[in-house]
């Protein structure tokens, strides 16, 4: 019995298998219905070469055919301007239309899709997956809205309207400005070529830059490497925390400059300007450019006190190791060679006097010359455009720079990188410790005193008195006329000393 029961089970399994095979055979599709979409890719390439406008003409010939009928019936949009759908939806024949999720877009200029989709434009970018076509220079960083502007860019979520060449790096709004840039969160309006690196607002200025938090307005060519406010001055410099809202401003941090008389003592690149200075690592390809770090220069009047090579130019200088040949007035501050130069002198310890464009790389003295440079310890007096990257003293000259310890008096546009004093000059700046008095637009980056000046700024601890529009970056006090009397006495003493020095020279 057990043997017969086993045969019956086998027959039952066979009959079930045959029944299942017949059922599957009935449900099989006809091979003639195969589309062959995976056999030939030429159809895809032909579809990609189609003109979007010809596609729109075919849509007009078939008005009863909905090209979006396959999409879920979440919503439909047709023949509208500035229409938006946040999720799944349909869009057609609209301008400046946006879809935040999945969908398709066609026949619109400057259209943006933040997620997955297709676009038929040129030079367009979508932050997610998709394609762009038929618009120029349109960019969308994420989800957002765009309308009535050309060459507009939105980095994240936000709105943009009625501006050209406007850029917003994060979340925010932008309107009615041209060539305006906002790096983070904030608002921008009615300015041109304005840049804000962090959070803040900008308005009514041109070519203004703010590196940190704050506000900027009504100035040109301004740069702010830190926190603070600056306004309505020219040739102003902020060595520490602060902002600049004037012309020919200098930022000692990181950045780029494309103007003239610009100075960036940190890391960066400079190009297309004259009399530009980069204090750290970088390259310069202009005239009167100075790079005190590592770099190369291929122009005239260029100075690189670090490692590098110079050739076939005049007034070229390298402060460290290098070679110079076939030029005039070429100098190397450390180890190097000189060939065919007109200037001579001891490169280690020496003196230079009564000449122009003379340079000493180590210890030395300079007097009565213009454009004099000392690489190490030295003194300078009664000359213009003097630069001392080491320890030294400077007086009675304009456009002087002392990067270490030094003193400055009775000159305009003088700069001391570390410790120093400044009296009776305009636009003077001491990024380290120092004192300032009787000047306009004076700035001290560290500890110092200020009196009787406008728009004075102290980056650290200091005192300010009797001036309007004063800003102190940290702790500060302003009091009494004692500082005024002290400044007057110091100025008189400095004037007497300078007269004696002038007579001796």
Curated annotation (Swiss-Prot):
Residues 26-62, 495-505 form a propeptide. The modification Pyrrolidone carboxylic acid is found at residues 106, 465. The modification Isoleucine amide is found at residues 116, 447, 461. Modulatory neuropeptide, acting presynaptically on nerve terminals to inhibit acetylcholine release. This is Buccalin. The modification Leucine amide is found at residues 88, 102, 129, 143, 157, 171, 185, 199, 213, 227, 241, 254, 267, 281, 294, 307, 321, 335, 363, 377, 391, 405, 419, 433, 475. Its main location: secreted. GO terms for biological process: neuropeptide signaling pathway. It comes from Aplysia californica (California sea hare).
């Amino acid at each position: 019995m057990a043997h017969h029961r086993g045969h019956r089970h086998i027959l039952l399994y066979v009959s079930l298998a045959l029944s299942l095979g017949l059922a599957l055979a009935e449900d099989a599709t006809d091979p003639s219905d195969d589309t062959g979409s995976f056999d030939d890719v030429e159809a895809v390439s032909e579809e990609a070469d189609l003109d979007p406008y010809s596609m729109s003409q075919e849509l007009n010939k078939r008005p009863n055919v909905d090209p979006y009928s396959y999409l879920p019936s979440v919503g439909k949009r047709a023949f509208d301007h500035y229409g938006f759908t946040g999720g799944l939806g349909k869009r057609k024949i609209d301008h400046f239309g946006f879809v935040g999720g999945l969908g398709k877009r066609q026949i619109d200029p400057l259209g943006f899709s933040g997620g997955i989709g297709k676009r038929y434009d040129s030079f367009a970018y979508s932050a997610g997956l998709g394609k762009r076509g038929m618009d120029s220079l349109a960019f969308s960083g994420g989800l957002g809205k765009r309308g009535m502007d050309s060459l507009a860019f939105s980095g994240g979520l936000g709105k943009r309207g009625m501006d050209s060449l406007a850029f917003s790096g994060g979340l925010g709004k932008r309107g009615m400005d041209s060539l305006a840039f906002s790096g983070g969160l904030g608002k921008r309006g009615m300015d041109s070529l304005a840049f804000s690196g962090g959070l803040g607002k900008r308005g009514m200025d041109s070519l203004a830059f703010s590196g940190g938090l704050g506000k900027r307005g009504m100035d040109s060519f301004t740069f702010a490497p830190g926190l603070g406010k600056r306004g309505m001055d020219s040739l102003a410099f902020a060595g520490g925390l602060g902002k600049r809202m004037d012309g020919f401003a200098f930022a000692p941090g990181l950045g780029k400059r494309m103007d003239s008389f610009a100075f960036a003592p940190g890391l960066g690149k400079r190009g297309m300007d004259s009399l530009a200075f980069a204090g750290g690592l970088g390259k310069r390809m202009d005239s009167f450019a100075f790079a005190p770090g590592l770099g190369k220069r291929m122009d005239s009047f260029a100075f690189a006190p670090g490692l590098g090579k110079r050739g076939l130019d005049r007034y070229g200088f390298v402060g460290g190791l290098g070679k110079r040949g076939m030029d005039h007035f070429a100098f190397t501050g450390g180890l190097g060679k000189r060939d065919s130069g007109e200037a001579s002198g001891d490169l280690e310890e020496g003196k230079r006097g009564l000449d122009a464009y003379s340079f000493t790389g180590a210890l030395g003295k300079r007097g009565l010359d213009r454009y004099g440079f000392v690489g190490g310890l030295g003194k300078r007096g009664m000359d213009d455009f003097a630069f001392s990257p080491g320890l030294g003293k400077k007086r009675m000259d304009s456009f002087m720079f002392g990067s270490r310890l030094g003193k400055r008096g009775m000159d305009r546009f003088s700069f001391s990188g570390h410790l120093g004093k400044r009296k009776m000059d305009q636009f003077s700046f001491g990024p380290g410790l120092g004192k300032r008095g009787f000047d306009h637009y004076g700035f001290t980056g560290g500890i110092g005193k200020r009196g009787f000046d406008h728009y004075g700024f102290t980056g650290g601890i200091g005192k300010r008195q009797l001036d309007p529009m004063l800003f102190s970056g940290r702790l500060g006090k302003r009091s009494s006329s004692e500082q005024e009397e002290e400044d007057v006495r110091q100025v008189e003493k400095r004037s007497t000393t300078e007269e004696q020095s002038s007579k001796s020279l």
